[in-house]
């Protein structure tokens, strides 16, 4: 990197700027690696939502995959209620997934001094 001279003839950069840029690039690589590892771990983190007093229970992973749905036998005959509870349960589990993803991402960004990245 070429040093730039100011009006007084003093150097305005060079060594310090290069070090800062190299440190920033290294930190960016580390952050990207940690985020990639976190994304891969989301398939192992489960979130659960239960609605209708436990009549419908949905288990999903943080990579947004539904893993299991349990439905109370009493709902077998009441399609409209079942449908409403499934919608409510899916919405709740998705909200929980997003919250958990944000919490996990926050742990990483705080390590790098980057608050509120997600």
Curated annotation (Swiss-Prot):
It is found in: Cytoplasm, Nucleoid. Keywords: Cytoplasm, DNA-binding. Its main location: cytoplasm. One of its GO terms (molecular function) is DNA binding. The keyword Cytoplasm applies. Pfam families: YbaB_DNA_bd (PF02575). One of its GO terms (cellular component) is cytosol. It comes from the Bacteria. Belongs to the YbaB/EbfC family. Binds to DNA and alters its conformation. May be involved in regulation of gene expression, nucleoid organization and DNA protection. This is Nucleoid-associated protein TM_0687.
């Amino acid at each position: 990197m070429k040093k730039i001279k100011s009006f007084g003839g003093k150097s305005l950069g060079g060594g310090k700027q290069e070090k800062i840029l190299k440190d920033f690039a290294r930190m960016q690589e580390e952050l990207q690696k940690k985020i990639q590892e976190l994304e891969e771990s989301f398939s192992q983190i489960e979130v659960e939502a239960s609605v209708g007093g436990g009549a419908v229970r949905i288990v999903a992973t943080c990579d947004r995959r539904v893993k299991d749905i349990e439905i109370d036998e009493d709902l077998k005959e009441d399609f409209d209620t079942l449908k409403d509870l499934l919608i409510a349960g899916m919405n709740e589990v998705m909200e929980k997934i997003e919250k958990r993803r944000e919490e996990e991402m926050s742990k990483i960004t705080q390590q790098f001094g980057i608050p509120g990245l997600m």
